[in-house]
Amino acid sequence: HLSLRRQRQMCIRDRISSDPALLATLGPPDLLEQYADESFTGYYTENPAAVFMGMVWWNNAWIALQCVLFGITGLWPINVLVQNAMGLGVSGAVMAAHDQVDVMILYILPHGLLEMTSIFVAAAGGLHLFWSWVAPGHRSRGESLAAEGRSLATVAIGLVFALFVSGLIEGFVTGWSLPWPIKIGIGVAALAAFLIYMLVIGGRAYRRGETGDLVEYEAGTPRLLAG
């Protein structure tokens, strides 16, 4: 299903980029050309690096927070992913129409590897929260939702730090005049560190029985038992 979805997105992007009528619906030709030739790359350098880093960190953290907070609905995380995919697809169509796809890829890869992975993890966490009350198992829906919500707080804290790192890369690396292999290498290293922490270190903790939830004393006794 994911591969079919990607194929549809690529077909839509290719259709827009190759169809002048569809491309015209995105804006006047001169503005689209300016976006492809100047605005897309200028976005990364038009503000001081520290200010820009703070802006993108806040924006990405807010997107991730929405996925977590409203994940209980089951719809909002999907909506966030679709909206972001559409925005990226439109940018890709404009850049493709002006033969600038390579520029777009180079400017997105350094920070985008970790950033996009973090957003997908946030969406997955939100959907897991939704599933916790749809299929609570042996627990009541309230107990299941409370336990998974407390565990998800650990994920949210980790994502704040991950998005801080991707913000640092976007603010201080992506727009720098460094060789692209170095920039992309920094992004790959950041993603590798994130995946190692999540899958290797986190996997070991999970196999030991760690869930990220509070112990019963800290969380409060869920029910009184008669004896």
Region annotations inferred by a language model:
Residues H1-I12:
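Single conserved hydrophobic/aromatic residue that forms the stacking wall/gate
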Residues H1-S3, M53-G54, I78, L109:
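Generic secretory/membrane-interface signal
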Residues R8, D30-A36, G87, A93, ...:
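Charged, low-complexity, helix-prone segments enriched in Lys/Glu/Asp/Gln
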Residues R13-E38, Q83:
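Interfacial/capping segments of alpha-helical transmembrane domains
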Residues L32-M55, I105-L114:
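Short aromatic-rich membrane-water interface segments that cap or initiate transmembrane helices
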Residues T45-W76:
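Individual transmembrane alpha-helix segments
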Residues I63, L69-G227:
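Generic detector of multi-pass transmembrane helix bundles and their immediately adjacent loops
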